[in-house]
Regions:
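Aromatic-rich, lipid-facing transmembrane alpha helices and their immediate juxtamembrane interface loops
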Residues: 1-151
């Protein structure tokens, strides 16, 4: 699902805005590196781990919505950190060299929907390792964001 959304995004500009992938994430299929779908999945699993920790074990409709909202918010927070680094590193390029606000809105909506869907499929679990990986990703991109870049 995540890879399909990225392919649609690259081909149409919807829902994130107009962007193209560089070659640093590996080979492309339909102008999109398959690795990006895996990165989405890893990030989603980590954000879901933390949302479960913070919201709790309740399985009520309200708790499920809260967990999905926290997951989506964590995903967007990571994307806010990741975007400037990824564009500077040549992972992808935005049309007009600016990150459109609709990118962050789309990330939130998609992550919210995926988090809700994920929790309906009980065979798909997230765990502490996913949560740790999320923190490592965040620390990695924060570190890179704070470093000076040569133009």
């Amino acid at each position: 699902v995540t890879y399909s959304v990225e392919v649609i995004g690259v081909q149409t500009g919807f829902p994130f805005g107009s962007y193209t992938y560089g070659w640093r994430l590996g080979p492309h299929i339909y102008d999109t590196p398959p690795m990006i779908g895996i990165l989405w999945l890893m990030t989603l699993m980590g954000a879901m781990y933390w949302s479960h920790k913070w919201v709790g074990d309740k399985d009520t409709p309200k708790a499920r919505l809260a967990k999905a909202a926290v997951t989506a918010t964590l995903m967007v927070a990571l994307d806010i950190i990741l975007e400037p680094v990824a564009t500077q590193a040549g992972f992808w390029t935005w049309e007009g060299d600016h990150i459109p606000i609709k990118n962050y809105i789309a990330w939130w909506v998609i992550a919210f929907g995926l988090a809700l869907a994920w929790r309906k499929v009980h065979s798909l679990r997230t765990n502490r390792a996913a949560g740790l990986l999320f923190l490592i990703q965040a620390a990695f991109f924060i570190g890179l964001l704070l470093l000076p870049w040569k133009s």
